[in-house]
Amino acid sequence: MKDKPKIKTRLKMVIAKNGKLLVTYDSMEDYYYYIGGKLEYGETVLEGAEREIKEELGEDIKLDFKKILYIRDFLQPEKDEHGLELFILGDVNKFEELEHYFDSEHGDKKWATWLDINNLPDNLFPKALTKKLQEDFKRNFSKSGEYVGKMDR
């Protein structure tokens, strides 16, 4: 009997500062995505978020965890993927120093970059979240824990 696939919990950071959004750019695939990764077994959401920030932005980066903004279903049955994504609003203790920070895990093909939050590119994934994020930014992210359902890539 085949084991049932597991549901993965992913943490995605929404780091907005000075009208900019901190994301990762993948130069091989030419797209942007929110910084984050999988929640490990035995970790709290806060511990996982802090670990992911350090892994992707450096050991000296501190995360100021504000709140969970969005909860999203991530379903790709054709790839046996089923996940739950938590988009976390937070802040970090650095700004300009993070531009083009290379994540050692991914070499020189992926790096952190700040994007103008009012002019986000079409290749920021998930695309379906962009307009909502921009509207919520204008409202100072007043809501929290909002279920946004299943969104296409």
Model-flagged regions — what are they?
Residues I68:
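Conserved active-site "lid/cap" helical segment
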Residues Y31-Y32, I71-Q76:
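Short, solvent-exposed loop/turn segments at secondary-structure junctions
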Residues I15, V23, E43, E55, ...:
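Intrinsically disordered, low-complexity segments enriched in glycine/proline and serine/threonine
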